[in-house]
């Protein structure tokens, strides 16, 4: 929701940046928790996301940085995510064909880190085997960069658009 981010552009286009009350979430706005009591946080910028996860998985620093860089690269491949109207670059077909699971599994053998990186799949009901990496990238990027909530509830968006 910060200026220059995809959601800000969309909400501004629909006139929602002035009429809906927004609140930025805390820096570590979400957490992935496991039955064993371990908790891992998602932070609200890619640099903080990396820093937070590297603190939890120091031996996986390269994998975490690679994940972050790949997400950001994938998002730039899809110009509509930033309301830039240009041709989609189909030359990087690997991006279109690769599943999110295959991408994440290729980064690390650490099962817990794999689960943490895939944790946002619930946001879009992503099926591990079927969800394309680019869908995971677009959702994860929006989630990490636009950690805001509607102060008076999400229904105000529907009311404003009606």
Name each model-derived stretch.
Residues 30-34:
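Short acidic-hydrophobic surface loop/beta-edge motif
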Residues 35-131:
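Rossmann-like flavin
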Residues 1-29, 108-111:
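N-terminal FAD cofactor-binding segment of flavoenzymes
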Residues 136-162:
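Helical element adjacent to the flavin cofactor pocket in flavoenzyme catalytic cores
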Residues 2-5, 95, 152, 156:
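Conserved active-site and cofactor/substrate-binding residues in soluble primary-metabolism enzymes
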Residues 11, 131-135:
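A short mid-domain helix/strand-loop element embedded in enzyme catalytic domains
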Residues 2, 23-26, 41-43, 124, ...:
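Generic, ordered loop/turn and secondary-structure boundary motif
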């Amino acid at each position: 929701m910060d200026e220059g981010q995809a959601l800000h552009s969309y909400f501004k286009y629909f006139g929602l940046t002035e009429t809906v009350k927004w609140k930025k979430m805390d820096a570590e706005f979400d957490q992935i928790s496991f039955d064993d009591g371990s908790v891992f946080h998602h932070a609200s910028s890619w640099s903080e996301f990396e820093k937070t996860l590297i603190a939890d998985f120091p031996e996986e620093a390269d994998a975490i940085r690679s994940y972050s860089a790949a997400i950001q690269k994938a998002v730039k491949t899809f110009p509509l995510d930033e309301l830039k109207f240009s041709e989609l670059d189909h030359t990087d077909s690997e991006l279109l064909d690769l599943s999110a699971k295959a991408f994440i599994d290729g980064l690390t053998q650490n099962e817990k880190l794999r689960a943490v990186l895939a944790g946002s799949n619930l946001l879009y009901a992503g099926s591990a085997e079927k969800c394309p990496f680019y869908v995971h990238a677009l959702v994860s990027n929006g989630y990490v960069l636009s950690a805001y909530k509607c102060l008076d509830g999400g229904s105000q968006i529907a009311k404003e658009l009606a």
